Amino acid sequence: MGFFKLKEHNTNITTEFRAGLTTFITMIYIVPLNALILSHANMPYEALLSATAIITILSSVFNGLWANTPIAMSVGLGLSAYFSFGLVQGLKLPWQSALGIVALSGAIFVILSFTKFRSWVMRSIPSDLRRAVSAGIGAFIAFIGLKEMHIVVTHKATLVTLGDFSDPHVLLGVVGIVLTFALYTLKIKGSFIIAVLITSILAWVLKLAPYPSEFFSMPASISPIAFQLDFKGIFFDASGAFTLALVPVIITFFVTDLFDSLGTLAGIGHKTDFFNDEEKNKELERTLEADAVASLGSAVVGVSTTTAFIESASGVEEGGRTGLTAVFTGLFFVLTLFCLPLLKAIPSNAIYPVLVIVGVLMFSVLEGVNFKDMATSVSTFLTVVMMPLTFSIADGLAFGFLSYGIIKLVQKDFKAINSGIIILCIISVSVFIFR
């Protein structure tokens, strides 16, 4: 396997196979969970199951071959939630137009990925703001998980309140959350999918959900959602008039995907010391290039933006050091295409607990934030709080970047207001102008 330079990376096929399997086990939950989230955009669930598996296969294998890094890729949960609840339900966009937005943001990412733009972003944007973005998205998707399980419900006086805990479906969600946290805390490999399966079995036994009539079948067609991108609805309103109202949304998808990828890869590097030399940094650059291409491809397949998955760290810790690990992970996902009846039978309240714990894990990056600095403290707080409260990643980003720039200006800390911050503040203003 000279292509992957196994000897140079002090690994072998057996180790890479085991690492790929480990990564697959830790992230298999993404197939039913992402399909469930995107189904709220009125997209067919069966096609979404297949499309999620297919883009995971293609993006992971492509990264393994292009970048030779053990980083698996799949659809990002934060942007999937924003796609369904922010664009389709919130802005009343057809899902075809939302896919067009995903494609345009992916195209921007591809163009800029082969320039020095990424390194410029890493230098110009404070690490604390990148952490705030990750934590804000974590709070956003955790809130969605609690909302969809009806653990948190609407209230006329207080906007939100606790749900009806006498409802067995709500209790099932609570059990799922406790079980998922317990298994993850015990560091059991595959804790997410194990918790989903146990909670599902409990739901089937208690007749809270129908038992699967079959476990295996041929893959569902993705034709209802593939190649369904609509660009006209992005730049022209219902009356046919030209509009730029959705430009900030396109930029939001791009910026969020960029930060998500950088944060994930930085996290893997922090956990495993994987990107600590010049050669590895070159591989990191190529991984970001693969991520950009995959993001564009995801819209074509019919799902939201792809990103590098932090679960790849489990494979790296298992010994994975080359792209062969990512290739094996992608190939393992082929199996999920033939398990669609089983995946369809999993009740939503067995899946959404995973969304809550993923949100918690994303939120944990705040431990490195310098809260002694007022600009950092306020911008972090507003980013994290405003994403779930406004039900919008774009609004959260805008509040965070604007507050950071304004406070640094008041503090006369002009060195902190670099070109990157100025551009992001201008973009943030446009978020409110083009509402």
What are these regions (language model features)?
Residues 50, 100-103, 251, 289, ...:
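Internal alpha-helical transmembrane segments of multi-pass membrane proteins, especially GPCRs
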Residues 59-71, 182-187, 252-260, 291-301, ...:
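Transmembrane alpha-helix interface/packing and boundary motifs in multi-pass membrane proteins
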